[in-house]
Amino acid sequence: GFVIAYAYDPRWRTTLNLKGFFVRRLVRLHPMVLLSAVIGAVTFSIQGGVQWNGTQVSTSALMLALLCTMFFIPAVPGSYAEVRGNGEMFPLNGPSWSLFFEYIGNIIYALVLRRLSNKVLTIVVVLLGAGLSLFAIADAASYTSIGVGWTLDGVNFGGGLLRMLFPFSMGMLLSRQFKPMKISGAFWKCTLMLVALMAVPYIPACAGVHLNGVYEMACVIIVFPLIVKMGASAGNSNKLYHFLGGISYPLYIIHYPVMYLFYAWLIDEKRYTLAETWHVVVPMYVALVVAAHLLLKYYDEPIRRYLSRKWVK
């Protein structure tokens, strides 16, 4: 939300229209969606083993799942296209569900949110924050967390919309009211904050209160916006920041097809600790980072430049 509002809000008053906005977003995001779908189909088709044996799935089902993933048509749990059997919207590349909601967020932004005054947007943010907090603290999905949105049922779709709409709207509001703060070493401070937040283990419920939901909402409502503001206030950049920023999207969209193979290997080998798996984890981590960088430089950026020349006015 912060990035979209920062990049596009001023343009609506001058050169940007709805068609131009949607074309720009598709050019930015969808080339890697298409490639990741193919990678997911290939890794699934070669994956044998006890868990998610893709070698036994018919070619027609795999092709249907591939087309659905490429064109962001979510699979209904138990349907022919839901080939992995986990109930995922996009069984060839599970995390695509979050990008699916981001696409919805872009549509809502272009049609509605960008037109709202700061006062109305603030009211929207408060209401969405209250709704997401209630969802999390009441454990509406019975997941003991707000890890919803990945499958196409009522609770997950509604929860996924809340998970996207609140931070998206909050990010827009932060962008509109942004005033840089004085901070040094913002990158490292933000990194340490994120590591500390993610290192907190699951917090069990107490006296009927889902404390894990309370913690998650404290992060989402207070800490994450602060981290965004700190990062945006940094005001400087270097090669490391550019490298990490560049690979972030390719790494996000390609890593999970490989993780499926890794999970299946863990289950087959019955290896569950880092001491038993580090010799696979470390090379896989390095390989994914290198692959993300190579795909950025030799696939994503060239295709986006080509499509921008043809379609973006």
Question: Would you name each region that the model predicts?
Answer:
Residues 1-9, 98-114, 128-184, 215-236, ...:
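Specific transmembrane alpha-helix
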Residues 10-15, 45-53, 114, 118-121, ...:
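Transmembrane helix-loop junctions in multipass membrane proteins, especially transporters and channels
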Residues 13, 58, 82-85, 157, ...:
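Helix-boundary and loop/linker segments of multi-pass membrane transporters
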Residues 29-103, 131-149, 154, 215-228:
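Membrane-interface helix-loop-helix regions
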Residues 131-134, 168, 193-301:
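Alpha-helical transmembrane segments of multi-pass integral membrane proteins
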